[in-house]
Swiss-Prot record:
Main localization category: mitochondrion
Positions contributing to heme b b566 binding: H97, H196
Binding site for heme b b562: H83, H182
GO BP terms in the entry: mitochondrial electron transport, ubiquinol to cytochrome c
Annotated organism of origin: Propithecus tattersalli (Golden-crowned Sifaka)
Binding residues annotated for a ubiquinone, in chain numbering: H201
TM ranges: 33-53, 77-98, 113-133, 178-198, 226-246, 288-308, 320-340, 347-367
Record text on subunit structure and interactions: The cytochrome bc1 complex contains 11 subunits: 3 respiratory subunits (MT-CYB, CYC1 and UQCRFS1), 2 core proteins (UQCRC1 and UQCRC2) and 6 low-molecular weight proteins (UQCRH/QCR6, UQCRB/QCR7, UQCRQ/QCR8, UQCR10/QCR9, UQCR11/QCR10 and a cleavage product of UQCRFS1). This cytochrome bc1 complex then forms a dimer.
Summary of the function given for this chain in its UniProt record: Component of the ubiquinol-cytochrome c reductase complex (complex III or cytochrome b-c1 complex) that is part of the mitochondrial respiratory chain. The b-c1 complex mediates electron transfer from ubiquinol to cytochrome c. Contributes to the generation of a proton gradient across the mitochondrial membrane that is then used for ATP synthesis.
Pfam short name (any one): Cytochrom_B_C
Primary gene name: MT-CYB
Cofactor(s) named in the record: heme b
High-level lineage: Eukaryota, Metazoa, Chordata, Craniata, Vertebrata
One annotated Gene Ontology cellular component of this protein: mitochondrial inner membrane
Designated name of the protein: Cytochrome b
GO MF term set: metal ion binding; ubiquinol-cytochrome-c reductase activity
């Protein structure tokens, strides 16, 4: 068995990635989220495949086909709610995974980090297009509002929006192409994940201390396979609780009304995992400025390695930086809350303050505090 594992051309790749992989001996539970993201991706592809067997990408039948899945298909409601709530779990793991990278300085592994940012953008695009497919009120108006943002691009904006729509409004052509993209993107994500892992295994994993772990490595299996399995069980528990007890908790009631282009919902908002970016978009009165802030709110992650001024890679022994990190987390919670509120006083002001704080923390406060900590440690 060992000979096959180590000599077979295909199995030896698996062996060097998941069995005999040398891993740091001190990586904590925050490192579990990579494998949990892999599990979420597998769940989304499998449930999505079964949903695609029954779904019809047509404006007249899309809404009723989703109803048909929930009512007439064997365990269709379980598949549908696993897919919808699985997306929420996916993003929860994704945000924690990125947060861990920030906290422990994993962004110094620049290739892995940059592929991760591309993955984040791709997953967000996939989730947005998936939200349009049930063709409820929020699906239709969400698609209209978000795609319309591209019209802010000078000169080519309007033409670009109509090209994406496939007409002069969100209609059948838009739904069909969104379904096609929503189907293909998870496979592109899987390919990107492989590249992500390839670069990670080139350098080896980071660890909580942020120091080289070459002198102290342990095999990935059985130690971290068991640890990842425990993480998976702890992820399945809340997911199943959501699916079986409160499947619509994270959804919008407006999406149970079929799409009607003649009736605008009182408050258009995306799913919870986009609310922080949506709040940043809304906090700027100018359309182009809002779109740029929205894109930069994610793209800012790409310049974090350039803003690293600390002599220590990890924040583990940098209490001031830790304090700023948790202020950033609280700020993101505030932005998420604001994104779900109507555009009125005092929410507008809170949103603007939270948006300014978000960019100030990353661009100014964190690099400055890191320099202060270097001085305190006489480095």
């Amino acid at each position: 068995m060992t000979n096959i594992r180590k000599n077979h051309p295909l199995i030896k790749i698996m062996n060097s990635s998941f069995i005999d992989l040398p891993a740091p001996s001190n990586i904590s539970s925050w490192w579990n989220f990579g494998s949990l993201l892999g599990a979420c991706l597998a769940l989304q592809i499998i449930t999505g495949l079964f949903l695609a067997m029954h779904y019809t990408a047509d404006t007249t039948t899309a809404f009723s086909s989703v109803t048909h899945i929930c009512r007439d298909v064997n365990y269709g409601w379980v598949i549908r709610y696993l897919h919808a709530n699985g997306a929420s779990m996916f993003f929860l793991c994704l945000f924690i995974h990125v947060g861990r990278g920030l906290y422990y300085g994993s962004f110094v592994l620049s290739e892995t980090w940059n592929i991760g940012i591309i993955l984040l953008f791709t997953v967000m695009a996939t989730a947005f297009m998936g939200y349009v497919l049930p063709w409820g009120q929020m699906s239709f108006w969400g698609a209209t509002v978000i795609t319309n943002l591209l019209s802010a691009i000078p000169y080519i904006g309007t033409n670009l929006v109509e090209w994406i729509w496939g007409g002069f409004s969100v209609d059948k052509a838009t739904l069909t192409r969104f379904f096609a993209f929503h189907f293909i993107l998870p496979f592109i994500i899987t390919a990107l994940v492989m590249v992500h892992l390839l670069f990670l295994h080139e350098t080896g994993s980071n660890n909580p201390l942020g120091i080289p772990s070459n002198p102290d490595k342990i095999p990935f299996h059985p130690y971290y396979t068991i640890k990842d399995l425990l993480g998976l069980i702890l992820l399945i528990l809340p997911l199943m609780t959501l699916v079986f007890f409160s499947p619509d908790l994270l959804g919008d009631p407006d999406n149970y009304t079929p799409a009607n282009p003649l009736s605008t919902p009182p408050h258009i908002k995306p799913e919870w995992y986009f609310l922080f970016a949506y709040a940043i978009l809304r906090s700027i009165p100018n359309k182009l400025g809002g779109v740029l802030a929205l894109i930069f709110s994610i793209l800012i992650l790409a310049i974090i390695p350039l803003l690293q001024t600390a002599k220590q890679q990890s924040m583990m022994f940098r209490p001031l930086s830790q304090c700023l990190f948790w202020i950033l987390v609280a700020d993101l919670f505030t932005l998420t809350w604001i994104g779900g509120q109507p555009v009125e006083h005092p929410f507008i002001t809170i949103g603007q303050a939270a948006s300014i704080l978000y960019f100030s923390l990353i661009l100014i406060a964190m690099p400055t505090v890191s320099l202060m900590e270097n001085k305190m440690l006489k480095w």
